[in-house]
Amino acid sequence: MIMAALPFKLFASIQYLLPQHGLSRFVHWAVRIRQPWFKNALIRAFCRFYRVDLAESVCSSPESFECFNAFFTRALKPGVRSVCSEPDAIACPADGMISQLGAIKGTRLFQAKGRCFELAELLGGDRSRTEAFENGSFVTVYLSPRDYHRVHMPVAGTLAAMTHVPGALFSVNVATTENVPNLFARNERLICYFDTAGGPMAVILVGAIFVSSIETVWHGEVTPPRSKTIRRWDYSGQGLRFERGAEIGRFNMGSTVIVLFGPGHARWRAGIGAGMSVKMGLSLGSCR
């Protein structure tokens, strides 16, 4: 991979020079090309390079997908992911790797290697929402290119609101988390707020350089078009309830999911920590 061939600081520095949004617009177009020779070759090359196993997918061959984006956001066969069944369990929202997990120290979340970022900046400056999660808990799950890219509910809850925060599109990996300050609070992100039996919860889908769009099951594609201002939606009173493990959104190309809980509600399981590979539905802890 390119990142492996470059020192981490150099790789991160190059990110500042790239036309991030232009590249994402190009990817949005390219991954929707339906010419069989093009999309089949692209899917095969991607599977070889990233060692993608299609055995778990509903569609198991490149020819079965209408375009590369359909492959990237592929559905899994029923039963290949089991969702934890303990009454108070927190289910992992996605396949990937735990980047960080722990407590929100006042208003600060740990990013990597001594770097932290502010909760208020992550939430787009929404003071009332910020207060609900101060001294709470968080988990950050990184989705690699080979992973299943649909996002699911960690605990049962009712959708309260959604916020889209425009921003940069740095790639998300070890190099950038260690070297780009406030990475998750400066990248484009979609924040979904839920009311749960264990208090407020936020599920945040963080964009990256080749994340051509983010969508939810209740709204559809949120980006593009990309806005230069923060957009907010109020869903209170609409009764949009989702059970634990239900699909709520997806990355069209992938990145990172951050889940926030209010103070005193989440307790992480022993043995769950940064660097651990996880599958959607795995119990990460409990929420009361």
UniProtKB/Swiss-Prot annotation:
Protein name: Phosphatidylserine decarboxylase proenzyme
Any one of the GO CC terms: plasma membrane
Classification via NCBIfam families: PS_decarb (TIGR00163)
Record organism: Methylococcus capsulatus (strain ATCC 33009 / NCIMB 11132 / Bath)
Main localization, broad class: membrane
Pfam families in the cross-refs: PS_Dcarbxylase
InterPro entries to which the protein is assigned, alphabetical: PS_Dcarbxylase (IPR003817), PSD-B (IPR033177), PSD_type1_pro (IPR033178)
Pathway(s): Phospholipid metabolism; phosphatidylethanolamine biosynthesis; phosphatidylethanolamine from CDP-diacylglycerol: step 2/2
Gene name per UniProt: psd
Posttranslational modification: Is synthesized initially as an inactive proenzyme. Formation of the active enzyme involves a self-maturation process in which the active site pyruvoyl group is generated from an internal serine residue via an autocatalytic post-translational modification. Two non-identical subunits are generated from the proenzyme in this reaction, and the pyruvate is formed at the N-terminus of the alpha chain, which is derived from the carboxyl end of the proenzyme.
GO molecular function, one term: phosphatidylserine decarboxylase activity
Subunit description: Heterodimer of a large membrane-associated beta subunit and a small pyruvoyl-containing alpha subunit.
